[in-house]
UniProtKB/Swiss-Prot annotation:
The lineage of its organism: Archaea, Methanobacteriati, Methanobacteriota, Stenosarchaea group, Halobacteria. Part of the 50S ribosomal subunit; contacts the 5S rRNA and probably tRNA. Forms a bridge to the 30S subunit in the 70S ribosome. GO terms for cellular component: ribonucleoprotein complex; ribosome. The keyword Ribonucleoprotein applies. This is Large ribosomal subunit protein uL5. Pfam families: Ribosomal_L5, Ribosomal_L5_C. Gene3D superfamilies: 3.30.1440.10. Belongs to the universal ribosomal protein uL5 family. The gene is rpl5. PANTHER family: 60S RIBOSOMAL PROTEIN L11-RELATED. One of its GO terms (molecular function) is rRNA binding. Keywords: Ribonucleoprotein, Ribosomal protein, RNA-binding, rRNA-binding, tRNA-binding. It comes from the Archaea. It comes from Haloquadratum walsbyi (strain DSM 16790 / HBSQ001). This is one of the proteins that bind and probably mediate the attachment of the 5S RNA into the large ribosomal subunit, where it forms part of the central protuberance. In the 70S ribosome it contacts protein S13 of the 30S subunit (bridge B1b), connecting the 2 subunits; this bridge is implicated in subunit movement. May contact the P site tRNA; the 5S rRNA and some of its associated proteins might help stabilize positioning of ribosome-bound tRNAs. The keyword Chloroplast does not apply.
Length: 185
């Protein structure tokens, strides 16, 4: 038995749980309808409207007003979406949180190969949040006898970076020790 076989365990292998693609427009009407159409074309799934959870007078939004749209992708749909979206952006190690999840933004929806600029619609940006887990994370979400995940089984940012680089063949920019401490000199 080789050394890699003894350290590999299928329950420790990271997996893609879900990908949430979100467009915040800030208002309802035609703008929001356009955003929903674009999301549906890019993600291949019907978008769900998101509403303001509380009033934000600086944006002119009241509680309950529709302000955006989102799509949650799981399984093969999430995998294929990331294969299209990750080559369009540069991902840094800093974008990974302490549990291995990461987010990135796409400034213009027209960067996707399936999208073309339409002056009637304009240009929309979108946010993508990727949630990674390991098998066994369900014990934290179940209703009965829920338990925390032990620290030795939690997904770390370095595990997540390694998984994304191997699974999607993208290069994630590393952060040097100098810039990690906040110093740029």
């Amino acid at each position: 038995m080789s050394e890699t076989d003894s350290t590999f365990h299928e329950m420790r292998e990271p997996q893609l749980e879900k990908v949430v693609v979100h467009m915040a427009v800030g208002e309802g009407g035609r703008e929001l309808a356009n955003a929903e159409e674009i999301l549906q074309e890019i993600a291949g799934q019907t978008a769900v409207r998101t509403t303001a959870t509380r009033a934000a007078s600086q944006f002119g939004a009241r509680e309950g007003d529709p302000i955006g749209a989102k799509v949650t992708l799981r399984g093969a749909d999430a995998q294929s979406f990331l294969e299209k979206a990750l080559p369009l952006v540069t991902i840094s190690e800093r974008q990974f949180d302490e549990t291995g999840n990461f987010s990135f933004g796409v400034e213009e929806h027209t960067t996707f190969p399936s999208q073309e600029y339409d002056p009637q619609i304009g240009i929309y940006g979108l946010d993508v949040t990727v949630n990674l887990t390991r098998p066994g994370y369900r014990v934290t979400k179940r209703d009965k006898a829920s338990q925390p995940i032990p620290s030795r089984h939690r997904l770390t940012p370095s595990d997540a970076v390694q998984f994304i680089e191997s699974e999607f063949t993208v290069d994630i920019t590393r952060v040097s020790a100098d810039t990690r401490d906040g110093g740029d000199n």
